[in-house]
Amino acid sequence: MARADGRSDDALREVRITRGYQDWPAGSVLVEFGRTRVLCAASVQEGVPRWRAGSGLGWVTAEYAMLPSSTNTRSARESVKGRIGGRTHEISRLVGRSLRACIDLAALGENTIALDCDVIQADGGTRTAAITGAYVALADAITWLSAAGRLTDPKPLSCSIAAVSVGVVDGRVRLDLPYEEDSRAEVDMNVVATDHGTLVEVQGTGEGATFTRSTMDKMIDFALAGCSELSRIQSEALAAPYPGELPGGAA
């Protein structure tokens, strides 16, 4: 069965990365995977969590949330409910540890970079879009910190990080699932990888069926190829000058 949007099984949706979407954070990005849109902001904060104080190491943390109207049925804000849901906690932790995989925390000194990922519109793959966009916001925050003279190493990023969903739908392995496919997938997987082709995290579940080792291998092959293309798109976005004003008027 053909995909509703006409893509081949191994094709990404149209991906757009817009840097400098907000004026105030050190890094901000609007990332779009098809109709999924996520605003990713990287804010620099002096100091680190209490358990890390005195270590000389920095920290990178993340918070993920969905706007009430990001889906076709409005959901109440978790702040109004009085508790953060398990899914939100899980994805926030995933984004944070994915981005920590690419950075030398010692180079930050005792500074924290907080990544806020807010889903404006959800059509599948929000967590993978958040990771992909958050890396670009993080890279811009590193540029800002470097201009401010607050890094002990001018190049603390060892690689880029991207993520994509992959699954089995209608018996076929498919890349970058929109909601229409994700909601009926027999197998669902999220893959986080570096631009070197190494894996950061793999989350896979047989939602409606078990799956074979050969199917898993094909899914990971599709995902790594997709992450490679996403890394290229990230690199193109970051090739342009820093989109805001740097400390000290640096260009």
Swiss-Prot record:
This is Ribonuclease PH. The keyword Chloroplast does not apply. Keywords: Nucleotidyltransferase, RNA-binding, rRNA processing, Transferase, tRNA processing, tRNA-binding. It comes from the Bacteria. Homohexameric ring arranged as a trimer of dimers. It comes from Saccharopolyspora erythraea (strain ATCC 11635 / DSM 40517 / JCM 4748 / NBRC 13426 / NCIMB 8594 / NRRL 2338). HAMAP family: RNase_PH (MF_00564). It is an enzyme of class 2 (transferase). It holds the Pfam family RNase_PH_C. InterPro entries: ExoRNase_PH_dom1 (IPR001247), ExoRNase_PH_dom2 (IPR015847), ExoRNase_PH_dom2_sf (IPR036345), PNPase/RNase_PH_dom_sf (IPR027408), Ribosomal_Su5_D2-typ_SF (IPR020568), RNase_PH (IPR050080), RNase_PH_bac-type (IPR002381), RNase_PH_CS (IPR018336). GO terms for biological process: rRNA catabolic process; rRNA processing; tRNA processing. Its EC number is 2.7.7.56. It catalyses: tRNA(n+1) + phosphate = tRNA(n) + a ribonucleoside 5'-diphosphate. CDD domains: RNase_PH_bact (cd11362). Belongs to the RNase PH family. GO terms for molecular function: 3'-5'-RNA exonuclease activity; tRNA binding; tRNA nucleotidyltransferase activity. The keyword Translocase does not apply. Phosphate binds at residues 87, 125-127. Phosphorolytic 3'-5' exoribonuclease that plays an important role in tRNA 3'-end maturation. Removes nucleotide residues following the 3'-CCA terminus of tRNAs; can also add nucleotides to the ends of RNA molecules by using nucleoside diphosphates as substrates, but this may not be physiologically important. Probably plays a role in initiation of 16S rRNA degradation (leading to ribosome degradation) during starvation.
